[in-house]
């Protein structure tokens, strides 16, 4: 899955390989401080860090990986620390 950003309306969208939209944000949404967790099923989540949102705004399309976990916020925090270091 990839993260896309539409500059005309400010919507972030997560798209599958076949370009169908899995999840979309609201218009002109504020960037989260740490990141965002998108649930796909009860234990499967997409973890999107602030850096990936910024890459999408810079016309890159970062690849997102699904994570199987009970504690997605902890995994997001660890991913953010790895990104910063």
UniProtKB/Swiss-Prot annotation:
It comes from the Viruses. This is Uncharacterized gene 1.6 protein. It comes from Enterobacteria phage T3. The gene is 1.6.
């Amino acid at each position: 899955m990839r993260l896309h950003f539409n500059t005309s309306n400010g919507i972030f969208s997560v798209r599958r390989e076949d370009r169908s939209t899995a999840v979309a944000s609201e218009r002109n949404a504020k960037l989260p401080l740490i990141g965002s967790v998108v649930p796909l099923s009860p234990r499967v989540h997409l973890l999107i860090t602030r850096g990936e949102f910024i890459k999408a705004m810079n016309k890159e399309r970062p690849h997102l990986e699904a994570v199987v976990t009970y504690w997605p916020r902890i995994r997001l925090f660890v991913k953010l620390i790895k990104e910063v270091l």
